[in-house]
Amino acid sequence: MFIFGGKCFLPQDLTASSGNFKRGVFMALRKVVVIAGPTASGKSQLAVDVARSCRGVVVNADSMQVYPDTPVLSAIPSAAERGGIEHCLYGVFPSSKNGTVVEWLVLAAGEIRRIWSEGKLPVVCGGTGLYIDNLINGTTPIPEAEPEVRHKVAEAAAAEGIPALHARLSTVDAVTADRLNPNDSTRVKRALEVFYQTGVPLSVWHRRPMVQKLPEAEFVTLKILPPMAELDERCARRFDKMMAAGALDEVRRLKDMKLPASLPAMKALGVPELLDFLKGNRSLEEAVGLAKLHTRQYAKRQRTWFRNKLKADVVLDACYQGAENIIFDVKKRL
């Protein structure tokens, strides 16, 4: 991709015969824009604006938006919000599945290479730091546990409780156990699955060399780090809009699916709280208030992670609400 006169051109828009130009075309088609930031910070709109300006395709990097049954609560961009721009990897895993970062990476690498092959720009957008970090920096090739191993661990969790499994983990992988919350069911079970499957502690796997899924990619990274006061207000306002858009009906349908509470889709922001209301355990006002609180807390954790962990070429210090200078800054780096 090339910039001339403030406009964005793709290689097929130009003609030249030199070998240097052809190599430049090859490298240009290996660019990937990554847009990261906390929930409600304007990532999706920025991704659409970049994609529209640079003939791009938006690739989802949000671990809740990979599930199809909570489009309102997980803020999957609507047709109107997409504005005619192609989006991919939204709703790709059934809600009955525990999609892994490795599975997402395989899909993302395939989509990014497809987008390159079409002469377009991949615009990866999301708030899941693990997805983005593994895409940019590579991942440890930890084998997935076989179904019988996962079943064994799940049975033990149901019979003994997660704190007991955490105690068991400490006997085989003290390093991992020390860094995990004893009540973090997903990570405690995953660490035990890895050990039972491979005989090697997860902490040892993490010390092994990283493997790049896209070694040929050159990333242009943007992160949005708005003040928490601005983010808090936007989180609360957006949840009110979600309620008006049918979030409660969405959770009611999810409840009818009778999925295990341990699945990621059942942990989306707002789902546990509204489920409590539907079960008669709290008032709707209490459920909404708690969901807003948890959303703000999650946004704060995301903001902290991206501030400390993600190196970026462009940093926005306010929520994105449209700005031509930001788009131009991105173009200069392509």
Segments from the language model and where they lie:
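Phosphate/pyrophosphate-binding catalytic cores of soluble transferases and nucleic-acid-acting enzymes
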Residues: 2-4, 9, 14, 19-334
